[in-house]
Amino acid sequence: MSWKRNYFSGGRGSVQGMFAPRSSTSIAPSKGLSNEPGQNSCFLNSALQVLWHLDIFRRSFRQLTTHKCMGDSCIFCALKGIFNQFQCSSEKVLPSDTLRSALAKTFQDEQRFQLGIMDDAAECFENLLMRIHFHIADETKEDICTAQHCISHQKFAMTLFEQCVCTSCGATSDPLPFIQMVHYISTTSLCNQAICMLERREKPSPSMFGELLQNASTMGDLRNCPSNCGERIRIRRVLMNAPQIITIGLVWDSDHSDLAEDVIHSLGTCLKLGDLFFRVTDDRAKQSELYLVGMICYYGKHYSTFFFQTKIRKWMYFDDAHVKEIGPKWKDVVTKCIKGHYQPLLLLYADPQGTPVSTQDLPPQAEFQSYSRTCYDSEDSGREPSISSDTRTDSSTESYPYKHSHHESVVSHFSSDSQGTVIYNVENDSMSQSSRDTGHLTDSECNQKHTSKKGSLIERKRSSGRVRRKGDEPQASGYHSEGETLKEKQAPRNASKPSSSTNRLRDFKETVSNMIHNRPSLASQTNVGSHCRGRGGDQPDKKPPRTLPLHSRDWEIESTSSESKSSSSSKYRPTWRPKRESLNIDSIFSKDKRKHCGYTQLSPFSEDSAKEFIPDEPSKPPSYDIKFGGPSPQYKRWGPARPGSHLLEQHPRLIQRMESGYESSERNSSSPVSLDAALPESSNVYRDPSAKRSAGLVPSWRHIPKSHSSSILEVDSTASMGGWTKSQPFSGEEISSKSELDELQEEVARRAQEQELRRKREKELEAAKGFNPHPSRFMDLDELQNQGRSDGFERSLQEAESVFEESLHLEQKGDCAAALALCNEAISKLRLALHGASCSTHSRALVDKKLQISIRKARSLQDRMQQQQSPQQPSQPSACLPTQAGTLSQPTSEQPIPLQVLLSQEAQLESGMDTEFGASSFFHSPASCHESHSSLSPESSAPQHSSPSRSALKLLTSVEVDNIEPSAFHRQGLPKAPGWTEKNSHHSWEPLDAPEGKLQGSRCDNSSCSKLPPQEGRGIAQEQLFQEKKDPANPSPVMPGIATSERGDEHSLGCSPSNSSAQPSLPLYRTCHPIMPVASSFVLHCPDPVQKTNQCLQGQSLKTSLTLKVDRGSEETYRPEFPSTKGLVRSLAEQFQRMQGVSMRDSTGFKDRSLSGSLRKNSSPSDSKPPFSQGQEKGHWPWAKQQSSLEGGDRPLSWEESTEHSSLALNSGLPNGETSSGGQPRLAEPDIYQEKLSQVRDVRSKDLGSSTDLGTSLPLDSWVNITRFCDSQLKHGAPRPGMKSSPHDSHTCVTYPERNHILLHPHWNQDTEQETSELESLYQASLQASQAGCSGWGQQDTAWHPLSQTGSADGMGRRLHSAHDPGLSKTSTAEMEHGLHEARTVRTSQATPCRGLSRECGEDEQYSAENLRRISRSLSGTVVSEREEAPVSSHSFDSSNVRKPLETGHRCSSSSSLPVIHDPSVFLLGPQLYLPQPQFLSPDVLMPTMAGEPNRLPGTSRSVQQFLAMCDRGETSQGAKYTGRTLNYQSLPHRSRTDNSWAPWSETNQHIGTRFLTTPGCNPQLTYTATLPERSKGLQVPHTQSWSDLFHSPSHPPIVHPVYPPSSSLHVPLRSAWNSDPVPGSRTPGPRRVDMPPDDDWRQSSYASHSGHRRTVGEGFLFVLSDAPRREQIRARVLQHSQW
């Protein structure tokens, strides 16, 4: 029946999904049970395996210390003995003779289960449960048992009442209450109902399984109307309780039924109690979901068991002595059953959140129950407390042996009552009775007494591990048993059995989740467990008590205490009881805490682990108590959270026991140990840091028994949530200093507090991470299994987090060496945890993320230490950083915050945004940083907005400290208004002068750079950025200068968030700040402070401390903000653009300041700042300055200029919001740089005089081109795929100088607009980058290299992307960047002389064929002008290889190949930042959004006609399908041409910008993207005056931002670009096919031939988004001006 195939199992086909598998190495092989010829014990072996593997049962049974012993016929004693063997024995095959004998004696009168005679496994299973009930609750009847410690009734029994309600007359029959241990269903009815359901519904779903079972169970069970109205009504069954283990017995018509396959296929792995019965009255039952964990099968008169072993997340097959691993999925079991013709008899569904039974009934029982539930073993859902007290039960069995004379009758009575609805009611009844009478006390009691103390722990652990596996066999054994076994199996796999494992699963989820995620569960358990942790041994005890009520726990406490103590002491002492009281106290506390906190906090994974650990706890309680006095407290802390886990760490033997192969048993007794053994290090990595670090790191896990370990895990989770450092101190203090009782008391209090804190923090972390450690339901058994495996992982992760947190604190305190040591330790722990996380993809990702962050932090610390060694600049950043946030030291931005941010400590991020931003940026791992940013995003946006200047200033201050001059700080203070922003920028200019030199110095030695010439400074800044990327310390020195410039910008912008937002008032300022590129991708979306911070970071060119800080904060802010609110992102982007524009003006500000009056207008206050030589400023100032500010404090002027340009960029369509896009600032910068270049020309004449308006600055036709391009692009709304990374950048938006916001195309919606702003920001950034390159970033070339570029400004972004990459970016464009760097270095002076666009410098690489190909690919759908500048516009596309070698860096930058998603913030600093990417993104290439999501550029779509406008010189781009159009001045859209013709161009520009932004190291390339004016035809860029006029002329409301590549990356001299003949080796000047990228490899031809011929595309390229009329006007002007 195909319909049956896994239809009802759905995604939860196997429990493993629910439980995180523990490393198989940590699990000892599952033990088989012998079945010698003639014994015919397979039915018993199957039932026994199921019981053992059911975590709930195993753990609950361990908790039971007292029972009514029946001597030789005591089934309880026999079970205790076998469980002890499971847990402790090293034998692979164990005899079940004792239990078989006790069972036979118990049911001797009934002649059932007699020796040598085969019997029914389901009946055996049910009777064993009833006998257990008799032994532990002899005074109660089977059907009326209310004992809290009765595993059978509390975990397995279904309290039902039947009633008939007539639908016609409404008559109702008297309710018939009854209890059943097994819910029997006819397989025939099951198949029939399944067919009917499938006929009624198109698709079967896993949720239908419960309904299917309900229908099948009542099928044909029709009753007459109670009022005899003649109606035949179906009986209704109402479930009154919430069993954690549901046993479904399948009744077969034949031993060789042909329905076997159909039945197996119809089985579901998830069962909802609400679906199974007509109605459920218990709220828990309504919500509980049980998972198939075990199945007893029958075939050929032989029983075998399948059980899901949560430890290894695999289904195990138990065939007596043979144990085989089936697979992780339920389908694997189905396959085997079909092949083996197995008939499922018992299905065991366990609640992953199930907990051990409460032993409150017993003197220790009350405590026991709470504790049991708290320490749910995930698999031991049924009567879990008893199971949990398994080992303890063994010891308690000795301690409290009592025989219940009426056990037999009770069992019998209960069996019949419970089976009221069961088909085998009578038989079951007798079986139950007999088994109770004879079985439990016989073997179990004897064994229990002798082995309970010693073997109880071991056995428990082993038992817990094996219960699952062996449970598998029992399942296979009998129909009834099978059903139950499946449940148990499922639950253990899940973390607990379905019925009683619901709570345990929750606990397990919480526990595992906590372990995995800062151990919140541990925290909840830690309240109890933390105290235990403090005591080392006490924790396990406490944990078992949590599981065990006081009564049961009494004995278990003794055994647990001794066990936990021995565990703590590395000795397994199952019988140690000295600390019983402490253990009890701890247990009580753990019980409460875990119930309250653990469940919530624990994720499915945690829960399972917790469950397993809990069983161990009872086993370890003695050792806990022993350790209770000493290490036990520490472990106690840990213990509550993760007793089992801790035990694993503590004792290899315990680990082995846990390794018994049964996760449930391991959790109970050996599973926790196994988990710890395999994952102890990984778990400890995170857990120890909090518990171990504070409390003596090692002891916490080493000395905590398994149970204690579970508590510890919980505690650690809580502590971790509360704070790594926080949990640490507690554990450390309690471990050694206090007596057991004192420590216990303190631990209880601490655990309560820690659990709460950890819960809250875990919730926060979870919220930030989007991970729910305790999901309401598990997707499948596999998930539950994963949960189980995460125990050790959780611990390791928490320890690592704790250590890392300490490292951050030390770093903040300035102790970099100690911080580095701790960071390395955290890295090692994270690596261990990574192994533990192998079970879960999420866990793996989490650990990997944190590992990357830690690695980056370590690198940043190393860099910082290096910086401190060369304290010239670092000292300044340090000074500034303290000003910003005491937490961050010079490189603080890199050091402390990353992890905090990752921890999603939004509050911290907010308070220490700058610091955290930097750290985040530096440590920015694609996921972690973004997560951090996500958490930061809202906060940082608001806080930054609130105090952007302060945050940004702080960041800038720290950055600038080294390079900052008074003027720089003044600039910081200056920003009081948009105008002031520019002034500040100019102020920054002054600092830039010094910082620029510093940048150079920084580049060289971090301290002397600021004294290098501005150009040098830029180049050095780039290089330093590059170096800083390599060496966080270097970035820090560079950063200061930039910080200064940016600070001014940020301050002005930040002083009034409105300034950032209100960059409209600062038209020039609102342009993207080139400095931003690093952080821009993140910060762009952030408020000004963040943006500024990013700018500062970019400006400081990876000023590691600031860079990391800013980037992190901004990135965090950005990531969440961008995805969540594009509008916010856009506004942030705009703010950032303004800031970046300011910073750019600061960086390029000197140039602009000296070059453009327009820029100067806004930055007039800073005009006083000494402008760099006009030539230099022009040549490389825009980008050089940007780089400078990015790289050094002296770049601020450049940034100011950038700011001015930013306004232009915004005017040209880059909204500030765009700037917020990581790479958008870059787009803004290119425009800014263009303007700067033009202004620089003007400034040459005007110096700081009045810089023409941005509109006038650019050549008219360039502007027109840009306008059209923007227009068309906006129309198309198809930004380049490359731009996609920064959605804001993706859209090409031209904003009018007077307008802050991008002029959105009428058809754009807000999202499109936002995306466009992002794209435009990217585009403008690219333009600015081009300008920067054009400006003459000869020295920046190094930085501009994909690597060097990444190393510098882009390095910042990339660093954010990969904080661990202190060196050059590792992108494929690295080579290009290197070439670019060299070219830029060479071309800096060239670019400087270049009037508007120094294209010679950047043209080689930029326009190389390969580079153009890349650009074309990334910019597919965008027009690549054939002109050399056009390639600049779209750095991705290659211009003629020889003539217009686009700077490789630029291309790369634009190409989306760079991992921009992670480091969306692309440096807009200069062409050098552009990572050359040979590949061209196809128009359809999905651009990674700033949120890290691949998205098509907003405007890009296959429907959009894409064409590359290749320069006449023969630049052609290959790899992208572009409309074959060659853009030359003739081909460029004229006034008569439709705007659409420009859409591709603008799109190209946008894409280029986007790509640049997208590509962390490709920012400069963006500049090329924007440069349309470049033409091989010798289109001469209008004189500076022309450009200035163009920009300045008020007649052009849409301010076109000519992208002047100030940096050497775009250093192709303007004369080369405009006047120079085709570069040698370049393709023919004639039009190129747009659809075919050049064949030449940009690397070869571009670099080889045109390193000297790079043309600054930004020179003449204006990216303008304006109304059609204005665009037409602009075009007309451009045409007139350039006379195309």
Curated annotation (Swiss-Prot):
Zn(2+) 2 binds at H133, C145, C150, H153. The modification Phosphoserine is found at S481, S603, S632, S671, S674, S1189. Residues 736-770 form a coiled coil. Keywords: Coiled coil, Hydrolase, Methylation, Phosphoprotein, Protease, Thiol protease, Ubl conjugation pathway. PROSITE patterns: USP_3. Weakly expressed in a few tissues. GO terms for molecular function: cysteine-type deubiquitinase activity; K63-linked deubiquitinase activity. Zn(2+) 3 binds at C166, C169, C225, C229. GO terms for biological process: protein deubiquitination; proteolysis. Zn(2+) 1 binds at H67, C69, C74, C77. Residues 511-529, 720-730, 884-894, 1155-1176, 1205-1223, 1334-1352, 1433-1442 have a biased composition (Polar residues). It comes from the Eukaryota. Residues 437-448, 481-491, 535-544, 608-619, 1192-1204, 1375-1385, 1632-1643 have a biased composition (Basic and acidic residues). The modification Omega-N-methylarginine is found at R12. The keyword DNA-binding does not apply. Changing L505V: In a breast cancer sample; somatic mutation. CDD domains: Peptidase_C19 (cd02257). It catalyses: Thiol-dependent hydrolysis of ester, thioester, amide, peptide and isopeptide bonds formed by the C-terminal Gly of ubiquitin (a 76-residue protein attached to proteins as an intracellular targeting signal). This is Ubiquitin carboxyl-terminal hydrolase 54. It comes from Homo sapiens (Human).
